[in-house]
Amino acid sequence: MVQRAPWRERASWALYDFANTIFSMNVATLYFSVWLIKDLGASSTLYAIGSDISSILVVLSVPFLGALSDARRRRKPWVMWFTIVSCIACAAIGVLGQTSIPVIGAQTINGAGAGGWHPGFHSLFWVIVAFTIANYTYQAAQPFYNAMMADLAPPEEHGRLSGIGTAVGYVGTIVGLLLVSPFFGGELPLVGPLPQGLVAGLRTWIPFTSHAGRVSTFVPTALLFLLFALPLFVFCRDHHPVLEKTAISWKRAFGDVLNTLRDARKYPGATSFILASFLYQDAIGTIVSFMAIYAIKAMHFPDGTETTLFLVLTVPAIFGSYLAGYLTDLIGPRRTLLFTIMAWVVLLIAMILVPSQKGFWGVGLLIGLVFGGVPTAERPMLLSLIPREEAGRFFSLMLLSSRAAAVAGPLIWGITVDVLEPLRGTGTAYRAAVITVVAMFALSLLLLRRVPETRAVRH
């Protein structure tokens, strides 16, 4: 029987959600895609390629790493080293952006035009490489982090612990936005411009932030990610590590993937759930990657206001995540997931149909409310379907399936926009891309209906 871990350990685990959500929002969602596509004039497809390469790397490496993690029952070292590398690569984006891009900072806010400057392929190549490494290592840490939860609380408390972690993560989103936005435009969202002396001092203190613009947000994001991950590095531990070294080969690791797929059939609903995760995680990842550029391009929000938009939308996500954790323990993770994904389908259709920015705000607030439901409920859902000692390889398999799907999602979005925009206009192209995401959610619902109700973790 799993005993509740000390408060300091559980809090440090939850605080890692706070840390990695700063990266997820500031880099994967808010600043990098807009900087690359709007400021530097690159195509949506180029961004999708960088995202897809990181997903392919996850697909190729996670089976081996998950097998090694389960064999030695050690999760923390993987979380720690992947996080450190992600922070270094994230900072490298800012360094490269301010040393290899010919026009930087505030000058890129108006974007690259057909008659103006264009960054060279060599410059863009290394920026994409840094982003790919940062995104890959950020994603690769997730299955090991999620698997740590099984040893931190008894099964009946998994929903609440997962919900607290997700809610704390969205608090991290807000804190990350507030602390990084002064490096972008010298102001705080909802507050306005900061004193020039304060902004100048911040940019002097933090290296490679001396220019305004999105390029100056990546180094502060990396530092915040590392800072708030430190408590997990220091206070969390692997509860039942195997001290003997275990040899794991790539061939055996990928053989274990097939074995895990076969073993999933022994646990009712596990296969259908993993396939559903394949689809809904792809859908969420695609929306997260392109929401900022959708708001600017399709809804015509003024450039720079996407920070305020995401800040406001994150507030209901905090309460929604905690509520989802409570519902997960009350009615079960399956029902919570079904309700959350049905809400996603309805709200994305509404987002396509709303004609005004006010309507978009309303729909966005509701999306924020349900946004944390999936990560909150899916961790207890998987733990309720499988034996606890196999958590590492099944969490790795779930990440593997979602990353394999994620190769398709952003690429389909990028191709849809690039093909339809010249023919039907920007608004139609981006709304058509959202329809592809709705289809992914709808298919995942059909699969989740085949998963039985479960309330306790298998032992």
Identify what each model region corresponds to.
Residues F184-L223, I415-M440:
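A membrane-interface helix-boundary motif in multi-pass transporters
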Residues M1-R10, D238-L275:
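Juxtamembrane intracellular "pre-TM" segments in multi-pass secondary transporters
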Residues V2-V59, G269-P302, E306-L309:
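Helix-loop boundary and gating motifs at the non-cytosolic
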Residues A140-A153, G373-P387:
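Intracellular juxtamembrane helix-capping segments at the cytosolic ends
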Residues T83, A89, V95-L96, P102-A141, ...:
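Hydrophobic core of transmembrane alpha-helices in multi-pass small-molecule transporters
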Residues P77-A92, R335-A350:
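Structural signature of the two symmetry-related core transmembrane helices
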Residues L60-R74, F319-G332, V417:
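Helix-to-loop junctions at the C-terminal end of transmembrane segments
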Residues R10, G94-G97, L224-F235, I435-H459:
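Multi-pass alpha-helical transporter architecture, strongest
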